[in-house]
Amino acid sequence: MCAVALGMGMSLPAGAADIGAGKLKATAVCAVCHGALGVSMVPNAPNLAAQPAIYLTEQLKNYRSGKRSHEVMSVIAKPLTDSEIDDMSAWYASLQMDVREPGAAK
């Protein structure tokens, strides 16, 4: 079972990614496969919650450029701007994901 929480009250340094914009874009583009809060309910679609922003940014840019290929992700990433990628990566990185053993106390 997974629990996801967003750290509220975090401020962004000047020029940093816009987490709010990232949430909006991710909801529109990514949530169908990767879940509304980055926890996938789809087989073969990885969880994105709590992944490091630098990792997500690099992978999305690799899909966009063709350096990395996937039937769906290459098409999804192609029109994304650097700013949109940074924003979505920051959104997913801002999420926390706690993984519990099956049957563990809640």
Predicted features and spans:
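Sequence/structural segment immediately N-terminal to covalent heme-attachment motifs in c-type
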Residues: 17-37, 49-51, 101-106
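Gly/Gly-Pro-rich "capping" loops immediately C-terminal to redox-active cysteine motifs
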Residues: 23, 38-68, 74-79
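C-terminal capping alpha-helices of c-type cytochrome domains
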Residues: 68, 78-103
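Conserved hydrophobic/aromatic "anchor" residues
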Residues: 26, 63, 91-92
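N-terminal signal peptide c-region/cleavage motif recognized by signal peptidases
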Residues: 9-13
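Cleavable N-terminal signal peptides
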Residues: 3-4, 14
